[in-house]
Amino acid sequence: MNKILLVDDDRELTSLLKELLEMEGFNVIVAHDGEQALDLLDDSIDLLLLDVMMPKKNGIDTLKALRQTHQTPVIMLTARGSELDRVLGLELGADDYLPKPFNDRELVARIRAILRRSHWSEQQQNNDNGSPTLEVDALVLNPGRQEASFDGQTLELTGTEFTLLYLLAQHLGQVVSREHLSQEVLGKRLTPFDRAIDMHISNLRRKLPDRKDGHPWFKTLRGRGYLMVSAS
């Protein structure tokens, strides 16, 4: 049973969400502020639902502290129209965001999509015949360990960032649409103002060292998508 840490200061909302998620088969632990969430966080937590506006330590500061020690998947719960919070959350390593008020089915679908990705990584680790290790320039992507390294040095990537990078490497030199990336990486259909994939690409550009061959890692083709640049 997957364990979810639900972090929100709205006690009525957390009570309703806890009941909903437990009916969907999840084990739910509740925290009402960021400090309490960090105290409860351990390796048994499979995913965090993290509200932005909270007392003591808000969601952004909590995410920043969390990412120093854990790569646990995080879905940020933001106020509708709060574009700055969404962008900042994604920059700091959130996997996805969901604006309030949200549809219960959409929340459950987002959770299941991210957990499927995490379970895929675990299966790769336990399967000698899983997806192959990929190499681009001095970058090595090992899906079994969900680990990226450059020139032998491990890169600190979130699970979502690794999945996105691996998918683009699988289609090296080919354009992959934002719609396909959103569906495969985040498990959701792309909406007109959804910038999650764009922000994850931006994070990868910031985290990846310069290539030895002098090429950029990615090209943006407006209206079409992204491609990972091949050496040729």
Swiss-Prot record:
Localization (cell): Cytoplasm
Alphabetical list of InterPro entries matching this protein: CheY-like_superfamily (IPR011006), OmpR/PhoB-type_DNA-bd (IPR001867), Sig_transdc_resp-reg_receiver (IPR001789), WalR-like (IPR039420), WH-like_DNA-bd_sf (IPR036388)
Presence of the UniProt keyword Phosphoprotein in the record: yes
Stated induction or repression of this protein's expression: Induced about 3-fold when stationary phase cells bind to hydrophobic surfaces; requires direct contact with hydrophobic surfaces for up-regulation of Cpx activity.
PTM section of the record: Phosphorylated by CpxA.
Annotated knockout phenotype: Loss of the Cpx envelope stress response. A double cpxR-cpxA mutant decreases transcription of degP. Cells are less sensitive to killing by nalidixic acid; double cpxR-srkA disruption mutants are as sensitive to killing as single srkA mutants, suggesting the SrkA protein kinase is partially regulated by CpxR. Hypersensitive to alkaline pH (greater than pH 8.8). Decreased numbers of stationary phase cells bind to hydrophobic surfaces, cellular adhesion has altered dynamic properties; no induction of cpxR when cells bind to hydrophobic surfaces.
PANTHER family cross-referenced by the UniProt entry: REGULATOR OF RPOS, TRANSCRIPTIONAL REGULATORY PROTEIN CPXR
Quaternary structure annotation from Swiss-Prot or TrEMBL: Interacts with cognate sensor kinase CpxA.
NCBIfam families: PRK10955.1 (NF008199)
Name the UniProt record assigns to this protein: Transcriptional regulatory protein CpxR
